[in-house]
């Protein structure tokens, strides 16, 4: 159990310091991964950016994920095979437009950095299905990084197995046998507002702005 994202991030940062990271960058999955990524980037003196991904929901139940979409990749579950291709194509198009707008809003239009040859640390506040992280890694691979290191406080067993298979290194503080949801393992699992993401990202990249009253 973690007190909050900040406590988990400090522990992760200590684990990451033992690695030989060359020309590194921290890529956080918004929104919950950003407070964690911000602290790790600060502790390791690395830049911080975002990797954008969003679940693809089932038409009969949008909360039920049938895949994950990034700006340039798509990972589908087996349930998606029974759905019309036209539905999937239309939804993917809408999702990509949405996450592109969100990225520009979060970064204030700043161009995304090159990842070629870099050691990329991908962070989130936890893994439930692992689909979002899996899709993020597949997308990041296309930018030819030197390595991809996944760092998360907690993961389900299934998600850990899925992500380990595609990451170069997998650092996870807890992989409990009984897992109902990521929030189960935090005393404080408050929602991370958009304006906090914007503030943390700007501050991490040496463009100081207010955190709007929020504390890590």
Regions found by a protein language model. Name each.
Residues 1-216:
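PRPP-associated nucleotide enzymes
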């Amino acid at each position: 159990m973690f007190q909050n994202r900040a406590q988990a991030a400090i522990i992760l940062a200590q684990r990451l310091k033992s690695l030989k990271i060359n020309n590194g960058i921290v890529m956080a999955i918004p929104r919950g991964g950003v407070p964690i990524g911000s602290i790790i980037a600060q502790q390791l003196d690395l830049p911080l950016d975002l990797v954008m991904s969003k679940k693809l929901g089932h038409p009969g139940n949008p909360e039920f994920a049938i895949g994950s979409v990034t700006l340039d990749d798509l990972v589908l579950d087996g349930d998606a095979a029974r759905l019309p291709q036209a539905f999937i194509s239309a939804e993917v198009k809408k999702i990509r437009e949405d996450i592109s707008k969100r990225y520009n809003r979060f970064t204030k239009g700043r161009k995304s950095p090159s990842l070629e040859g870099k050691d990329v640390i991908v962070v989130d506040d936890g893994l439930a299905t692992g689909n979002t992280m899996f899709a993020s890694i597949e997308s990041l691979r296309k930018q030819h990084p030197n390595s991809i290191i996944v760092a998360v406080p907690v993961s389900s067993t299934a998600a850990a197995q899925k992500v380990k298979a595609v990451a170069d290194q997998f650092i996870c503080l807890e992989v409990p046998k009984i897992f109902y949801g990521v929030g189960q393992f935090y005393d404080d699992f408050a929602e991370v507002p958009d304006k906090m993401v914007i503030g943390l990202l700007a501050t991490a990249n040496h463009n100081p702005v207010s955190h709007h009253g929020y504390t890590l």
